Amino acid sequence: MIDKIISLLEKNADTNQAQKMSEYMQNRFEFAGIPKPKLKELIKPFIKETSKDNIDWNLIIELWNCKYREAQYVALEYLQKHRKQLRPDNIKELKYMITEKSWWETVDTIDAFVGDLVLMDSGLKNLMLEWSTSDNIWLRRVSIDFQQKYKEKTDENILENIIVANLGS
């Protein structure tokens, strides 16, 4: 499956667009040069084909480790489609995704998945407190943002503790 996706990215690569996309991300990542709307269209068959399957973390991690940034976007689309299958013990895979190839545009998607897990297992709030003092800025960011879709379910005490832990950081 991974080879099929990489082939799809390479067949649709646009070097001029890739350079612009890379520059926008401060040259932190290599791009194939496929804008997100086109990428979503290209991967629709893959997402549909795998939508009824069990979540495949090996595939997600392989995509995450791919050289093209668009592969990480494919992983996030796949994860979004399988979101209902997420379980609290998947926090380790999400942490990997947060701390590897980190940048705002992927981390800000993952934080909602983390939020889902914390709602399933309130014991993960302690992990969010740990992350709030991590040396990794992206774990800190997720600890601050994981509740952003909670509305009335927001735990104001934990939010306050996390914000206080990050004052001046």
Language-model features, listed with the residues they occupy:
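Alpha-helical scaffold domains
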Residues: 1-169
